[in-house]
A protein has these predicted regions:
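Interfacial catalytic loop of ABC nucleotide-binding domains
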Residues: 14, 46, 63-65, 183
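Conserved ABC ATPase signature
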Residues: 65-69, 73
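Short catalytic/signature loops enriched in Gly
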Residues: 1, 152-262
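Conserved ABC ATPase "signature" region
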Residues: 43-60, 166-170
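P-loop NTP-binding/switch modules centered on Walker-like glycine-rich loops
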Residues: 88, 95, 99, 103-181
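Q-loop/switch helix immediately C-terminal to the Walker
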Residues: 14, 23-34
């Protein structure tokens, strides 16, 4: 597993808790190389200096401690550590949620630049769809631990199929007050069910304004509506009649109906 782990690294959500306060920056960033026995100490130090410059810091920061840096700088250190082994995949777990809004855009731009420069693949975990839009090619929406929609990024924002995705997008702020006034704000009612004991059928049905009896009884499968856009919903939104009929025909022999009858589309 060790060779595989070199290719997968993580950037943590909290830039304060994820850095050891007793270690200097140089040690923090070089630890992955030391653990994997990559290079001599001199080579590791040179590599750390290069990485620090790549993420917008200075090699002079090598001997400083985490408490000497701001939150944004600490997150840059965390990103530098994730790059030490030249990974192919980086899992970014809410990497900007703990930062000031003024710093978030800088961090997103850095991640975007690194992705292009180093040919990285990100698994970007976030609850803010406004942030996700800037870094994603494909977006997966999850609810209570289940994948409910998977779509090319821009298509999700223009044509959400799952009602939960629709509600999430309605909460994304729009800077234009005229457009914001015309948009419907969907407020979900009720409490979020327990992930330990989720509802039967579709897990979203207790809070869904389109839910019917079939939603309470049967869990909808993930269905491909074309163009790589998949959703798990008995009453899909923004799907034309022809596509609904095609999907219904393809699943006619299934014991679990994939979608509601085409006449119920909206």
């Amino acid at each position: 597993m060790r060779p595989l782990r070199r290719e997968m690294q993580i950037v943590f959500q909290d830039p304060y808790a994820s850095l050891n306060p007793r270690k200097r920056v140089g040690t923090i960033v070089s630890d992955p190389m030391r653990i994997h026995n990559l290079g001599s100490r001199a080579e590791q130090k040179r590599r750390v200096g290069e990485i620090l410059e790549t993420v917008g810091l200075s090699p002079e920061h090598y001997n400083r401690f985490p408490h000497e840096f701001s939150g944004g700088q600490r997150q840059r250190i965390g990103i530098a550590r994730s790059l030490a082994l030249r990974p192919k995949l980086i899992i970014a777990d809410e990497p900007v949620s703990a930062l000031d809004v003024s710093i978030q855009s800088q961090m997103l731009n850095l991640l975007d630049d690194l992705q292009k420069e180093l040919q990285l693949t990100y698994v970007f975990i976030a609850h803010d769809l406004g942030v996700v839009r800037h870094v994603s090619d494909r977006i997966a929406v999850m609810y209570l631990g289940k994948l409910v929609e998977l779509s090319p990024a821009e298509e999700l924002y223009t044509r959400p199929i799952m009602p939960y995705s629709e509600a999430l997008l309605s909460a994304v702020p729009i800077p234009d007050p005229d457009l914001a006034a015309k948009r419907e704000r969907i407020v979900l009612e009720g409490d979020v069910p327990s992930p330990i004991n989720p509802p039967s059928g579709c897990r979203f049905h207790p809070r869904c304004r389109y839910a019917t009896d079939v939603c309470k009884q049967l869990e909808p499968p993930l269905v491909d509506y074309g163009n790589g856009h998949l959703a798990a919903c008995h009453h899909p939104l923004n799907v034309d009649q022809a596509t609904l009929q095609k999907v219904a025909a393809a699943t006619a022999d299934s014991s679990t109906p994939a979608v509601a009858p085409p006449t119920q589309s909206r």
